[in-house]
Curated annotation (Swiss-Prot):
Signal sequence bounds: 1-32
Protein name, UniProt field: Complement component C8 beta chain
Chief localisation class: secreted
GO biological process, one term: complement activation, alternative pathway
Native organism: Homo sapiens
Regulation: Membrane attack complex (MAC) assembly is inhibited by CD59, thereby protecting self-cells from damage during complement activation. CD59 acts by binding to the beta-haipins of C8 (C8A and C8B), forming an intermolecular beta-sheet that prevents incorporation of the multiple copies of C9 required for complete formation of the osmolytic pore. MAC assembly is also inhibited by clusterin (CLU) chaperones that inhibit polymerization of C9.
Residues carrying Phosphothreonine: 418
Associated disorder: Complement component 8 deficiency, 2: A rare defect of the complement classical pathway associated with susceptibility to severe recurrent infections, predominantly by Neisseria gonorrhoeae or Neisseria meningitidis.
Keywords: Complement alternate pathway, Complement pathway, Cytolysis, Disulfide bond, EGF-like domain, Glycoprotein, Immunity, Innate immunity, Membrane, Membrane attack complex, Phosphoprotein, Repeat, Secreted, Signal, Target cell membrane, Target membrane, Transmembrane, Transmembrane beta strand
Gene name tied to this protein: C8B
């Protein structure tokens, strides 16, 4: 199948370096927010007035999508009575190249005399459609314990234990979903958080009565606290990128069998509107004489913890895993990760994050006799007192007039020759487009923060998580041959990580960011650049930062160690651009 025009998979792209500074993709609290529209037209208009767009001397050659040859057919699976084969993505399409338009796996019926031993003995009631095994005491109790209502069928009488309506915990649906950590996107449900095992004790939070799911060990409300911003100054884009974005990047590189110790902050998919907006607005200041003031306020409203064992899996995930072939076939296991993610959440912090970045023109600041410390002081105290108490500003070593000048420039930043070049805002939690709209108009006020905090309380985002690989949900309680399936999932996860990486994309021009969407690569261009490869720009001889190529395969195990390498040549640094950050080689223990 080499050189074919095929492939239509839904796997998201490995998250690029900006992920975690951006918020939670497709989370409760992010729906309805469209920050990509705020201010972008004005920014582009100002460029059009002051600069003439020109094309870089680059000839774009369409790159066609290319798949590997088919793998060999597996033997006939005795339980599914099917056999399988698959193909890998070798080269994504790019620059209007020919796409891959058909499936990257094939399944066909077959006949075998081998017996199927895939059934796990059930001592209770076997649900008719979902195949779930539930305790007989849960029959006819008014709850859909099976997920298909078969436990409530043919009942002479319903003995309903819960007499009062109770709400579901905030964000509980996303907490039950699998998460693709290569994209920070939530996928299909892997846990059933609508299963209660007959439990009906109410849990009160803010006078609201909640029903605790069987799988949940604890869901603890947190005090809102004060709306305070932590402000930090960065004298260059490279400092800003390293300290704000790269430190909160996705977990795209794994050791320890894809296990990640501790709790970490979630990011956002580069495919989301907010992710693209953030890249376009901040990347254009790379290799400019701009300085950055980054401010952030965190709000925690609840802590969530999953039970450590005996979990009730969602019936859709249960059935999909049961249909996996025991003989390894990457295509079937790859589809499981596409549909249900790579990991599941064991602990989480729910709440919101309000952050903004002021981008200042260093030369204009010097002409106006401003320092970044002045901007810091004015921004911080404008939030606290609304710019009303002159003595506070004087005590900070900056005049009232100077502070008012800065704050007015923030509102008028789309005009030419201003000291404030941009205000980039990211609001997570609250699901309020109104708040996001206001956030782009001026620095946050106490009233705006109170409005946002009230919205976060009832519609929080998942901002931090602790996770386990999806294969940890495959236990002998639910699956025969669980050890075989787990080992297959581990192997497939390593292959999946390599296949969905944007390192397969050709470089974008002008520090554009390549993003792999299924089997197609796109370039996200900084504001001021456009074209399929960001090749049309107002800037000449732009410094190009280096980007890593794909990792090599792991070496064979020698001396209980194995290694792999990668090269900084996709593209290499050019015109004084920055080198790649991170290691060029990795070493792991092996046996």
């Amino acid at each position: 199948m080499k050189n074919s025009r095929t492939w239509a998979w839904r796997a998201p792209v490995e998250l690029f370096l900006l992920c975690a500074a951006l918020g939670c993709l497709s989370l409760p609290g992010s729906r309805g927010e469209r920050p990509h529209s705020f201010g972008s037209n004005a920014v582009n208009k100002s460029f059009a007035k002051s600069r003439q767009m020109r094309s870089v001397d680059v000839t774009l050659m369409p790159i066609d999508c290319e798949l590997s040859s088919w793998s060999s057919w597996t033997t006939c699976d005795p339980c599914q009575k099917k056999r399988y084969r698959y193909a890998y993505l070798l080269q994504p399409s790019q620059f209007h190249g020919e796409p891959c338009n058909f499936s990257d796996k094939e399944v066909e019926d077959c006949v075998t005399n081998r017996p199927c031993g895939s059934q796990v003995r059930c001592e209770g009631f076997v649900c008719a459609q979902t195949g779930r095994c539930v305790n007989r005491r849960l029959l006819c109790n008014g709850d859909n314990d099976c997920g298909d209502q078969s436990d409530e069928a043919n009942c002479r009488r319903i003995y309903k234990k819960c007499q009062h309506e109770m709400d579901q915990y905030w964000g509980i649906g996303s907490l039950a979903s699998g998460i693709n950590l290569f994209t920070n996107s939530f996928e299909g449900p892997v846990l059933d958080h609508r299963y209660y095992a007959g439990g009906c004790s109410p849990h009160y939070i803010l006078n609201t009565r909640f029903r605790k799911p069987y799988n949940v060990e604890s869901y603890t409300p947190q005090t809102q606290g004060k709306y305070e911003f932590i402000l930090k100054e960065y004298e260059s884009y490279s400092d800003f990128e390293r300290n704000v974005t790269e430190k909160m990047a996705s977990k795209s590189g794994f050791s320890f069998g894809f296990k990640i110790p501790g709790i970490f902050e979630l990011g956002i998919s580069s495919q989301s509107d907010r992710g693209k907006h953030y890249i376009r607005r901040t990347k254009r200041f790379s290799h400019t004489k701009s300085v950055f003031l980054h401010a952030r306020s965190d709000l925690e409203v609840a802590h969530y913890k999953l039970k450590p064992r005996s979990l009730m899996l969602h019936y859709e995930f249960l059935q999909r895993v049961k249909r996996l072939p025991l003989e390894y076939s990457y295509g079937e296991y790859r589809d499981l990760f596409r549909d249900f993610g790579t990991h599941y959440i064991t602990e989480a912090v729910l709440g919101g994050i309000y952050e903004y970045t002021l981008v200042m023109n260093k030369e204009a600041m010097e002409r106006g006799d401003y320092t970044l410390n002045n901007v810091h002081a004015c921004a911080k105290n404008d939030f606290k007192i609304g710019g009303a108490i002159e003595e506070v500003y004087v005590s900070l070593g900056v005049s009232v007039g100077k502070c008012r000048g800065i704050l007015n420039e923030i509102k008028d930043r789309n005009k030419r020759d201003t000291m404030v070049e941009d205000l980039v805002v990211l609001v997570r939690g609250g699901a309020s487009e109104h708040i996001t709209t206001l956030a782009y108009q001026e620095l946050p006020t106490a009233d705006l923060m109170q409005e946002w905090g009230d919205a976060v309380q009832y519609n929080p985002a998942i901002i931090k998580v602790k996770v386990e690989p999806l294969y940890e949900l495959v236990t002998a309680t639910d699956f025969a041959y669980s050890s075989t399936v787990r080992q297959n999932m581990k192997q497939a996860l390593e292959e999946f990580q390599k296949e969905v990486s944007s390192c397969h994309c050709a470089p974008c021009q002008g520090n554009g960011v390549p993003v792999l969407k299924g089997s197609r690569c796109d370039c996200i261009c900084p504001v001021g650049s456009q074209g399929l490869a960001c090749e049309v720009s107002y800037r000449k001889n732009t410094p190009i930062d280096g980007k890593w190529n794909c990792w090599s395969n792991w070496s064979s195990c020698s001396g209980r160690r194995k290694t792999r390498q990668r090269q900084c040549n996709n593209p290499p640094p050019q015109n004084g651009g920055s080198p790649c950050s991170g290691p060029a080689s990795e070493t792991l223990d092996c046996s």
